[in-house]
Amino acid sequence: DEFKVKVIPDNAAKILALRNGEIDAILGSSRLSAEGYTEISQDAAFGHAMDDSTNQTRYLGMNLNKAPFNDPLVREAISYAVNQQELETSVFDGLETAAETLFTNEKPNCGVEVKTYPTDMEKAKQLMKEAGYEDTNDDGILEKDGTSLAIHFNYSQSLASVDNAVLSIAASLKELGFDVTIDAVDMNTWYGALMAGEYDLTF
């Protein structure tokens, strides 16, 4: 017996290949978008299974060695600004739930009480003001010491559903007053930048 692995980067193309009989299975939740999984799971022609137990948590990575993320007030503001409920329902189609800790409380020794950050844009804006950022020219972008709050937000485009998640997060940051440039790169480029510390914000 043998099996062949076929790499199909595009999410829609994967589903089409499955429907056309070109492939027999799609393996891994990171390789299929939430809407793609929902589409397949609702089709009686296909079987599907999802493991309820996972050690994986998606998180927003900030480079603490660079401004503005070296300021805890800015980091707290971002925590209030990002709409986790929208990510849970609209981006991940209810298949993933918002996490308050790195590991789910269902895991051994992980049921800890932590401070939570419900979505509160007004609170986020107040924290940015406390950190010294203001929109002095009414262009929607915050400034501090004459410098606009511009950041690069990079991510690996090889993982399903991440595109929409990044767009949702970027929209929240723009509402907060960030000038966000999104950089979608391949996995190797993303990982190399991460290890070298050559990033502002990553997902």
Residue ranges and their predicted role:
Residues 14-15, 23, 36, 74-75, ...:
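Short, hydrophobic alpha-helical packing/hinge segments within bilobed ligand-binding/sensory domains
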